[in-house]
Amino acid sequence: MTEELATPTLADVVDAFHTLFPPQLAAGWDASGLVAGRAAAPVHTVLFTVDALAATAEEAIAEGAQLLITHHPLLLRGAQFIPDSTYKGEVLHTLIEGGCGLLGAHTNADAAVEGVNEALCDAIGLIDREPLTEAQTQVLDGQEHAVGTGRIGTLPEEITLKELAERLAAALPPTAGGLRIAGRADQPIRRVALCGGAGDSLFDAVRATDAQVYITADLRHHPASEFRETARVTGSNIALIDCSHPASESLWLRSAADRLRKLLAERGYGIETKLSALNTDPWDFTVPTGVQPGQDAHSASTAAAPAWEL
């Protein structure tokens, strides 16, 4: 006979989630944690998404969720007023009026065991992984794990830069911008550094490794150009792969949902977890430059970016 699982409170769910992704791993400037919700409220369904948007808040209510877990904190940059005439106010009013809490897990989810960066490692098959930055320590199931921002690891066998980019592209959800690559298509790759989300702040850490390519998102012109020129001068020739910011972090959602559900079950609680189907990348389509009207522009994407199936 199977024992029926109890319904957890919001406090129970948050405690379990923070066991997996401890708040103390978050950067000092971050704003991860519970944004809204009554601790004693029962939670039957949790929806996971990268961003807290008006659309994902409405989706949470439509899906019958009592908690929306996002990667990006809604109030990262704070807000003094939250009327529904503002984006952040609209999100919070929608959730609160619909009986749904809001929890953000940002840099703590980046750094943690089986977090954002390790999901990206899994997607391309990296082994022998280590934190890219100075390691923090996370205790999980009685064992200490070295964690931190970014990862560096090894591919089981050498492949070309183009093959690696194609492997990554196949693993990520569709976005209008796709991937941007700096480096020779036939460049051999075995050692890979990566950081989900915006990662140009880790360029110095990448240079200090033996990485042959760095995968990240939101690369700006000047930092990327200086990184590539420095690589040429020093002879390292580290390639770059630039992803969509939310796409690079989205692969973590399924793992986080599965692990939360499993941990709560071990504690005697049952919940349903769902993944958002909404594409939260802000870009809708691209148009290639240097192409005159009427010319073949097969590389252009003129259709709205499709929904994500995570």
Residue ranges and their predicted role:
Residues M1-L310:
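Hydrophobic structural segments
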